[in-house]
């Protein structure tokens, strides 16, 4: 699984997850003969032999310092499986859950962009270890009590945690130790509303308020902007190259299918619904929690991070996010964009047909497209009601009617289609004389899905049989 592809003149630095769940790196040289992009070509004499654009037009190569998104996919194919296979093995990264607690003043919570209030503690969890980094002292007895409370609280999970507390003289020392000696080595860091608050707060607190250089969070000291949406408004946050920092709330909202009734997206509600375990309740204010009941403050912080890890094991939503990026062979964060995954997949399948997607310099205005038809229900009391749920309905329609981009002919309800053409009810006409790109891709993925379902069913049957054997042996022993 690829984390990031960082381009330097003449080479690629690629980070990926290895078989141990850690980050490894591959450097690939890009010879000058491969440093180009394709463009549409009107002069036959300049056209590249043997290649056409996806829509059947001539193309030419033009020099380029860096490979664009289509050329990257083509370059990996040209490099060969022997050089790139390890990049796309189905390896999952070690996950670390994180949660911060910030000083709350009479003005309330500080905004992450300003990060004007001190970070009081940081929880850091990967079973069996639960670290809390804090600013106040705790006795050995208090730490033992916190560990007991943690394990009592999450007893339903069947897990036990070892609690480790580290105290610091000041916030800067705490943040540096946490980031340099712990977070820097983690392949995947996540938390609840982590982009919108915790991570953005840590970054801005360090760089704007404490004047700390935390470029070391990236092995190459390179960072990039990532755009998030909060309440309909876009905001940019900074993320380090070659490390996955992911908001579990974001992937939960996008991909979770386990929690049926989503009344709200708070950690307390979701953990209760999925695990039957709630956050820690405290009757006072956050100020009182830190000032008067510091041991409960630390307990509260620790449980929040533990709940993230337990949710991931229960929901497995992170696997969906990471798996999508891997099977479509894009950088992990690109899995948030269906368009980027589709473009990468189309590029690979087209390239094997000697078709490419040229760089198009035309700028078009944004267009609106008609969505799927939804029948307007008529409110009433009915004696018979039926609900139909078709397996893979849209992919099946696209495969059946040969719907793709490169074989589209015209949209005209009066058009008379011949034997090698397919006309849909909307009047869209497609060339059916060959298997087009999108139906080929869908058939391939559909076949993989059926195979995966069969393997899953066989595993479930084997598990049930083993449970039965175990029960019979226990009864025999008794």
Feature-to-residue mapping (PLM):
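Conserved RNase H-like, two-metal-ion catalytic cores of nucleic-acid enzymes
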Residues: 3-40, 78, 82-188
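Short helix/loop capping segments that flank catalytic or ligand/cofactor-binding pockets
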Residues: 105-108, 133-134, 199-200, 254-256, ...
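Conserved DEDDh/DEDDy metal-dependent 3′-5′ exonuclease domain
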Residues: 135-262
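Acidic, Mg2+-coordinating catalytic module of metal-dependent nucleases/exonucleases
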Residues: 183-207, 245-340
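Non-catalytic propeptide/linker segments at domain boundaries
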Residues: 41-91
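Helical catalytic core of nucleic-acid polymerases
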Residues: 384, 390-478
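Extended, Lys/Arg-enriched charged tracts that mediate electrostatic binding to polyanionic substrates
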Residues: 76, 81, 87-107, 214-232, ...
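Common nucleic-acid-contacting/processivity interface regions adjacent to the catalytic cores
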Residues: 285-402, 464, 470-478
């Amino acid at each position: 699984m690829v984390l990031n592809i960082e381009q330097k003149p003449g080479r690629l630095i690629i980070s990926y997850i290895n078989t141990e769940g850690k980050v490894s790196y591959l450097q690939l040289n890009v010879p000058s003969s491969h440093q180009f992009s394709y463009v549409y070509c009107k002069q036959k004499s300049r056209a590249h032999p043997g290649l056409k654009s996806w829509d059947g037009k001539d193309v030419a190569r033009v020099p380029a310092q860096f490979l664009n998104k289509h050329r990257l996919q083509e370059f990996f194919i040209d490099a060969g499986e022997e050089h790139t296979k390890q990049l796309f093995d189905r390896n999952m990264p070690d996950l670390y859950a994180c949660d911060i607690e910030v000083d709350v003043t009479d003005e309330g919570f500080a905004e992450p962009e300003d990060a004007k209030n001190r970070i009081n503690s940081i929880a850091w969890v990967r079973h069996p270890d639960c670290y809390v980094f804090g600013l106040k002292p705790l006795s050995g007895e208090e730490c033992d009590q916190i560990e007991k409370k943690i394990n009592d609280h999450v007893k339903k999970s069947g897990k036990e945690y070892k609690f480790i507390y580290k105290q610091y003289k000041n916030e800067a020392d705490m943040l540096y130790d946490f980031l340099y000696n712990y977070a820097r080595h983690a392949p995947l860091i996540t938390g609840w509303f982590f982009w919108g608050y915790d991570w953005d707060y840590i970054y801005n607190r360090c760089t704007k308020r404490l004047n700390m250089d935390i470029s070391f969070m990236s092995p190459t000291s390179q960072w990039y902007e990532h755009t998030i949406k909060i309440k309909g408004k876009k905001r940019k946050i900074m993320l380090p190259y070659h490390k996955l920092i992911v908001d579990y709330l974001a992937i939960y909202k996008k991909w979770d299918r386990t929690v049926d009734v989503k009344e709200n997206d708070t950690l307390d509600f979701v953990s209760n619904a999925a695990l039957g375990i709630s956050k820690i309740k405290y009757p006072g204010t956050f100020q009182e929690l830190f000032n008067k009941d510091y041991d409960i403050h630390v307990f509260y912080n620790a449980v929040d991070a533990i709940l993230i890890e337990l949710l991931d094991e229960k929901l497995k939503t992170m696997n969906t996010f990471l798996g999508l990026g891997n099977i479509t062979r894009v950088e992990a964060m690109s899995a948030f964009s269906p368009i980027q995954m589709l473009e990468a997949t189309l590029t690979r399948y087209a390239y094997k047909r000697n078709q490419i997607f040229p760089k198009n310099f035309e700028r078009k205005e944004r267009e609106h497209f008609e969505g799927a038809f939804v029948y307007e229900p008529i409110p009433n009391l009915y004696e018979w009601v039926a609900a139909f749920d078709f397996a893979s309905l849209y992919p099946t329609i696209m495969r059946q009617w040969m719907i793709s981009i490169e074989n589209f002919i015209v949209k005209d309800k009066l058009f008379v289609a011949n034997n090698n053409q397919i006309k849909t009810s909307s009047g869209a006409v497609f060339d059916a004389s060959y298997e087009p790109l999108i139906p080929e891709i869908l058939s391939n993925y559909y076949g993989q899905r059926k195979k995966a379902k069969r393997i899953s069913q066989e595993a479930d049957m084997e598990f049930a049989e083993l449970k039965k054997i175990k029960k019979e042996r226990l009864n025999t022993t008794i």
